[in-house]
């Protein structure tokens, strides 16, 4: 799967975002090493601590189905700024991603790719 195809899957997931409080929709598409794609969106709650980010939704969906090896994740948002993983997502990602797992975001009209080790430094 190409990066553009993975981003397209993330954009599909963004459409399911439940974000009535922030109005900031996020979608993610997670590519496993065996080629499966798991999507997720952000799901807000009036108790903000109960909110789940798109990245964690996709990761938890994959892990709950027995998949724990990943190649890449694409993250998109409804705003003009790139959607970078928050601290909690980075912590969860560090549990399941290898240092070379790719994180793909839309930035400046194109795609920017980071590795897991790059976003942790």
Language-model segments: residues:
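C-terminal binding/interaction regions
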Residues: 2-19, 65-121
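Short, well-ordered amphipathic alpha-helical segments that serve as non-catalytic structural scaffolds
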Residues: 9-12, 54-62
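Short solvent-exposed loop/turn micro-motifs enriched in small/polar/acidic residues
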Residues: 21-23
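Short beta-strand scaffold segments in enzyme catalytic cores
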Residues: 25-32
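Short acidic-glycine loop/turn motifs at beta-strand connectors
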Residues: 32-34, 107-108
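Compact, glycine-rich, soluble single-domain proteins
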Residues: 42-56
């Amino acid at each position: 799967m190409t990066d553009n195809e993975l981003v397209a899957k993330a954009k599909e997931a963004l459409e399911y975002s439940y974000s009535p409080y922030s109005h900031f929709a996020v979608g993610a598409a997670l590519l496993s090493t065996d080629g499966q794609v798991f999507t997720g969106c952000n799901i807000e709650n009036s108790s903000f601590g109960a909110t789940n980010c798109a990245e964690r939704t996709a990761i938890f969906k994959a892990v709950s189905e027995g998949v724990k090896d990943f190649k890449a994740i694409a993250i998109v948002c409804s705003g003009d700024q790139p959607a970078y993983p928050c601290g909690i997502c980075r912590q969860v990602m560090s549990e399941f991603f290898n240092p070379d797992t790719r994180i793909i975001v839309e930035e400046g009209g194109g795609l920017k790719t980071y590795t897991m080790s790059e976003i942790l430094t």
